[in-house]
Amino acid sequence: LFDQKTIKYIPIHYVLNISPSQEPNYYQHRPVVPINNQQMPYRYYARPVAVRPHAQIPQWQVLPNIYPSTVVRHPYRRPSFIAIPPKKLQDKTVRPNINTIATVEPTLIPTTEPTVNNVVVPEASSEFIITSTPETTTIPVTSPVV
């Protein structure tokens, strides 16, 4: 590991290169990248030149525009100016409302009401035993039709 305090003060474009004879050489550091690399901008670069004999270059024949383009290109709008259009109602065919649900019959829900019966037992005359017997009543409930 290098001492980061000493490397911190060296300018970025100058890097200490150790030569095979272990002597420090101060050269401007250039990464090893091909000259024609498009990602690395250089002051001096070589343009690829195609050398050809003087010959006729075939060109595309211009055809008439018979088939119109199917894709309509809309101009780009910024999101702040885009308004959400309301949903378009499609042509709805009138459908008769047929009630597929059978006629609603009242549902009987049993409710329990505890009743207290005081029964006097001859063995224990001074004590009362409380027994509760549920009494069922039916209430007709109709569910609303959806």
Curated annotation (Swiss-Prot):
Q: Where in the cell is it found?
A: Secreted
Give the sugar-modified residues: 107, 112, 125, 142
Residues with the modification Phosphoserine, per the entry, are 125, 143
InterPro entries hit by this protein: Casein_kappa
Q: In which tissues is it expressed?
A: Mammary gland specific. Secreted in milk.
Q: Where is this site: Cleavage?
A: 80-81
- Gene Ontology CC: one annotated term: extracellular space
**Per UniProt, which keywords does this protein have?**
Glycoprotein, Milk protein, Phosphoprotein, Secreted
Return the similarity comment: Belongs to the kappa-casein family.
Q: What does this protein do?
A: Kappa-casein stabilizes micelle formation, preventing casein precipitation in milk.
Q: What is the official name of this protein in its record?
A: Kappa-casein
Q: Which organism is it from?
A: Tapirus indicus (Asiatic tapir)
Gene name? Answer: CSN3
